[in-house]
Amino acid sequence: MLMRKVPGFVPASPWGLRLPQKFLFLLFLSGLVTLCFGALFLLPHSSRLKRLFLAPRTQQPGLEVVAEIAGHAPAREQEPPPNPAPAAPAPGEDDPSSWASPRRRKGGLRRTRPTGPREEATAARGNSIPASRPGDEGVPFRFDFNAFRSRLRHPVLGTRADESQEPQSQVRAQREKIKEMMQFAWQSYKRYAMGKNELRPLTKDGYEGNMFGGLSGATVIDSLDTLYLMELKEEFQEAKAWVGESFHLNVSGEASLFEVNIRYIGGLLSAFYLTGEEVFRIKAIRLGEKLLPAFNTPTGIPKGVVSFKSGNWGWATAGSSSILAEFGSLHLEFLHLTELSGNQVFAEKVRNIRKVLRKIEKPFGLYPNFLSPVSGNWVQHHVSVGGLGDSFYEYLIKSWLMSGKTDMEAKNMYYEALEAIETYLLNVSPGGLTYIAEWRGGILDHKMGHLACFSGGMIALGAEDAKEEKRAHYRELAAQITKTCHESYARSDTKLGPEAFWFNSGREAVATQLSESYYILRPEVVESYMYLWRQTHNPIYREWGWEVVLALEKYCRTEAGFSGIQDVYSSTPNHDNKQQSFFLAETLKYLYLLFSEDDLLSLEDWVFNTEAHPLPVNHSDSSGRAWGRH
C-alpha cells in the first residue's frame, strides 16, 4: 500500500491511522487533485497542444486534404480577403463555397467538388486557372459583359437600312431564303444526328469522325452564332441547352489542335460575346486548358495533335512537323481565352509562336508550310496560300484589326508576307485570270485550291491599312483573285467550284482530275464575296452569291439536309453523304451577311476567325481596360 512506503511511518495497527496522520493524508491528496484538475481547466489555451491532436496536412493531386479533429464539428470556411492566399478549409469539411466559388491557392491546386462530368471540377495539369461556373460568387476574375457591349460601335444585329440600289423586297426575300436553308440544315441535323459531330443526310444518321478526340456536337457549337444572328431563337435555345446539359469534356482521344480551336473554342467564344451566357465562357476556358499540353515542345511550337487522355502533345519525334496554318491559327482565340479567364498562359503560348517565327530565317520572305516543333527549323520549302498555309496569313491581318490596330508586329508580318507572295507566287494566266500558285523550292505548281479563295477577302480586308500608294492596288488585286475563283464556279456544270483548279495545257480555272473535282460545301468563295461587297457595294458580288444559293439548292439539298457532291462537272452528281459543320458555321453565315446590312456584325466591331466565328475588336478606353476586363 501507498502509506507503507512513506519513510518513518509506523502504523498503530496493520490498517489503522491516527487522526493527525489521516488529516495530513487527506490534505496531501486534496492538493494533488487540485493541482491536476487545475492544470486541466485553468491553463491558457495553446494552439501548439491542439496540433498534437491533428494529423499532418498532406496533398493529393487536385485536393488539399486535412484530417478531422476528433470530437469537433467542422466549421464553415471563412471567405478570405481578396489578395492574400485563402486559408485552408476546416478539417473534414466539404463546404459548397470551395467548389461554387473556387479561388487560386498558392502552391496547390483548387479543392473542388464535382457536380457532373469530372472535367468540370478538375483543371488541366500544369496550367490550372480559377474554376468558374454559372452563378459563381467571388470569382477572382470577372468579365464585365455590359461594359464590353457598351463599347461596341454598332448594335450586334444592326439597325441601318440596306444601302444597295436593289429593291428591298428582293434582298429581303433572298436573305429569308438563306435563313430557311439554315433552318432546314439545323432541323435535319437535330432530327437525325443531334449530339453527333455531323449529319449524314443520305443515311439519316450521325457521324463522329476522329479529329475531335471524342468531343461531340461540333455542328451544335459551329451553329450557335449563325442561329443567333439569323434570329432563329427557338433553334438557338435548343443548341444552348445541349451545350449546357450534354457537352462534356471528359474525353480521352487524340484531337486536332487546330480543328478543336477554330470550331469548338471559336464557336463557344463567339456565343458568349454575342449573348453573355456564362455557360459558353466556362466551357471555352475549360476546353482551352485541355489544349495547353500541345505546347509542351522544345520550341513551344505546338504539335498538331494533342491527347486528351495523357495530356501529351503526341507523335513527338524529331522527324515530325507542325503545319503553318494550324499553329498559326490560334492567336485570335487564345488572346480571348486570356481576356475571359485572366490567365496569361494562353496569350503567352501564342506570343511565343510569333517570337519563333520572327527569328527564323524565311526563304525569300516566304513561310513554308512545315516546321519542326523540336528543332524550330523548316522541314520543307513548300509554300501555299491554300491548304496548309492559308489561315496563318489571315490571322496576321486579323490580329492587327482585333487589337484595335495596335499590334504592329502582326501588321508588319502580314504586309511583308503579302509582298513576298506577290513577288514569287502571284501569276496572271494567258486568259487574264489572276491566281496564287504554290511554290515548291522555287518551282511553281500553277494551281489554286478552293481554300486559297479566301485570299480575295483577306486582301480586301487589309487594303485600308496598307501604305497609301498600295491601297488601290490591293483592292484591285482582291477583286481580280475573287473573279478568278468565281470563274472556277462558272466553268462547272453545277456552278459550284472544285477542290482545286489549274492553269496549264490551255485549260484555266478547272480541275484536271476527278480527285480534285469534288465540292464539300466549302465557304471560301462566298466569304470573299461578302468582304468585297462590304468594301465596294458592287452588285456583282450579290449576283454571284445568289448563283451559289441556287446551285446549293439544286445539287446539294437532299431530303434530310445538305450534302457535298463528288463531281462538280456532272449535271447529275453523286452526293458524299456529309453535311459539314462548317456549312452552317461559314457558308450560310457569309451568304446571309452578303444579303444583309453592313452593320450586322459590323467589321468595325468584329473579326471572324477562320471558322467564321465573330470575335470582338479591342475598343480600349483611356484607362487601358479592354473588353470590359476588371
From Swiss-Prot:
The gene behind this protein is MAN1C1
GO MF term set: calcium ion binding; mannosyl-oligosaccharide 1,2-alpha-mannosidase activity
Task: Write the protein's name.
Answer: Mannosyl-oligosaccharide 1,2-alpha-mannosidase IC
Q: Name one Pfam family in it.
A: Glyco_hydro_47
**Sites where a glycan is attached:** 250, 618
State its role: Involved in the maturation of Asn-linked oligosaccharides. Trim alpha-1,2-linked mannose residues from Man(9)GlcNAc(2) to produce first Man(8)GlcNAc(2) then Man(6)GlcNAc and a small amount of Man(5)GlcNAc.
Enzyme Commission designation: 3.2.1.113
Q: Which residues form the active site?
A: 499 (proton donor)
Class of enzymatic activity (EC top level): hydrolase
Extract one GO BP annotation from the record: ERAD pathway
Q: Which residues carry this modification: Phosphoserine?
A: 164
Disulfide topology? 453-485
Q: Give the PANTHER family listed for this entry.
A: MANNOSYL-OLIGOSACCHARIDE 1,2-ALPHA-MANNOSIDASE IC, MANNOSYL-OLIGOSACCHARIDE ALPHA-1,2-MANNOSIDASE-RELATED
Superkingdom is Eukaryota
